[in-house]
A protein has these predicted regions:
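ATP-dependent adenylation/nucleotidyltransferase module used to activate substrates
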Residues: 1-136, 231
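ATP/NTP-dependent adenylation/nucleotidyl-transfer catalytic domains that generate, transfer
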Residues: 132-231
């Protein structure tokens, strides 16, 4: 299990308790320090966090993941078998039949240690399929699902909805504090901050909006005053 330093603690405890044989792979550098080093926080368009902590880890191996098409529009474009490359433009996709035809060449690709093969065996499963399978086989699940979470990933993931991120910073206030510290440091390094405080930089970041839209919604709308025309 690749840790990112922004994993929900409930997930880590669940894995350690129920799957003690799973190896916890700690990152060489926390995502906070990585953001400071890069001078920018991860965003929906600039998802360097995925490349650093998820996609390139495990190069040279076949990795099974639980991605499903029903989860999002982006994931609906995934295929059952994919080669993961650090460069998204060079990634390839196959179904099982195509993978069998190219298996020899794919193994050679994995052998160079620069790519990994990712297999999504439940890609076409629905939410009901997942829960039916878990209940039928008495497989335990993380408590976060019982607390209203539909999907679990990194806390404050840029790909999550704003509503999800607002809930997460309420549940995990330490993550918010850490990111605000990062905002202060990247501001010192010269990241364009439009004169915002680290707290406002964080609010802008989790909104996922452009600076103009975020600023207009947060500050300009508060300045509007409507003349009372009633007599």
């Amino acid at each position: 299990m690749n840790l990112t330093s922004v994993d929900p603690p409930e997930v880590i405890r669940f894995v350690r308790k129920n799957y003690p044989e799973v190896e916890m792979i700690k990152p060489k550098m926390s995502i906070y320090n990585m953001a400071v080093e890069k001078g920018i926080l991860p965003t929906m368009r600039l998802r360097w966090c995925c490349a650093e902590y998820k996609e390139t880890s495990g190069a040279g191996y076949i990795t099974l993941i639980g991605v499903r098409k029903a989860e999002s529009v982006r994931r609906s474009k995934r295929e059952i078998v994919e080669s993961m490359n650090a460069n998204p433009k060079k990634r390839k996709q196959w179904n099982f039949d195509q993978f069998s035809e190219h298996e020899e060449s794919l193994v050679q690709c994995m052998g160079n240690g620069k790519e990994k093969i990712v297999v999504s065996p439940i890609l076409y499963w629905t939410d009901d399929d997942v829960w039916t399978f878990l209940k039928a086989n008495n497989i335990k699940h993380c408590s976060l699902y019982d607390n209203g979470y539909r999907r679990i990933g990194c806390i404050c993931c840029p790909m999550s909805s704003f509503k999800q991120k607002v809930r997460e910073i309420k549940d995990y206030p330490h993550v918010k504090k850490n990111w605000i510290k990062v905002c202060a440091k990247v501001k010192e390094k010269g990241l364009e901050s439009y004169g915002l405080s680290p707290d406002d930089m964080f609010d802008w970041w989790i909104s996922g909006k452009s600076y103009k839209r975020w600023y207009a919604e947060k500050y300009l709308q508060q300045k509007f005053k409507f003349k009372d025309t009633t007599e």
